[in-house]
Amino acid sequence: KDPTIQCSFCKRRVVVHSQYDLPVYDPRSGFALCARCVTDIYKAIEAHQVEVNKEADAETMSNLDEEMSRIKPHLIKEYLDKYIINQDQAKKILSVAVYNHYKRMKYGFDHKEDELDEIEKSNVIILGPSGCGKTALLSHLAKMLDIPFAVTDSSSLTEAGFVGSDVEVAVRNLYYAADKNITRCEHGIIYLDEFDKIARKSGENNTITADPGHEGVQQSLLKMLEGSEVEFTARGQRKHPEAPTIKVNTKNILFIVGGAFVGIEKIIAKRLKATDTGIGFGAKIEGQNEKPKYNDLIHKTRPEDLMKFGIIPEIIGRLPVICTLEDLDENALLRILTEPRNAPVRQYKKLMEMDNVDLEFSDDALHAVAQKAIERKTGARSLKGIIEDVMLDIMFDIPKSDKHRKVTITADCINNHATPIVEDLE
């Protein structure tokens, strides 16, 4: 029996059982590719990819020049002000971080690598309580920008050997957000949410139950944050030695990590108290007996506080910009209910307007919604849900008639599920 088979591409005959001469062979269909053809195909693909990347680089450069004129820090903040109440310092920090990211990209495109003075990335860590606007800030920022942006839940990440997602999934998410354009992906932004959930057990914070792999996850993220080549398989493909892989360099990807960091204010207070008692040989400090408020403490976060919380020093060194968000008080929640373009009250008014209904909320009702959110300790996150709970029956019944009506939501509706006041206006 002839031990050779014809290559389906070049028609050259090669030995069937030689993996070196015949790396691709399907005995069922008879399809075969010899080693020479496989090499030629890979070279052709690589040459094509080089041309594609050149075109993508030229397009990215062209877009950068246009983008630089509209993403000045003050313009980014003005845009965020339309949707996010308070958090002015955080808006400034993120606006500058994003603008500098664009400048760093432009500098890289304008100069050859051997001409470059190194401008290091200014990755950002965001701290703030649940519902204070961390995710909202970044989602609106992403809408404004013309660069890929992807969010990954850090709590789902595990180090090799544990069940869960490998850290490479963060880059893979960005790759797909960039429509599989590697050049755009390599200049995008990754947001690692719930970053506090991967704090190590040895930290002073006892409110979390960390898995043994959490410090390992942080170690796995180190090179990615600094800049390295990350290799991953396409979505839906199992990881095995023969699977084709995609390579992305993270050198120019901006990383933003964020979380509630529950309990870090206690670490900060402890540090400040230790410092205060050492001043003036134990002299009493004015207001020393008063319990510091969260908002007074969180803005004083330092790298050593994050280390005591359970973030390893090497990670902190790669997150030079600390951005803190304040807890929202009742006045801030009231403004969030009514002022931004996407304010819950404005949304429901528009929805009811489409059913020929004038929707009104009494001042007491708005205060009741804000107070309920504070009681739940969920910040702005629960505002829409509280209103939705009250509005459900009205939104179900109102479409039964086309009459022009007015619906008034009172504090009694919010607190006791009383029926809203409905008046005919015809």
Where are these regions (language model features)?
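AAA+ P-loop NTPase nucleotide-binding core of proteostasis motors
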Residues: K1-A35, A44-N86, K91, V96-F149, ...
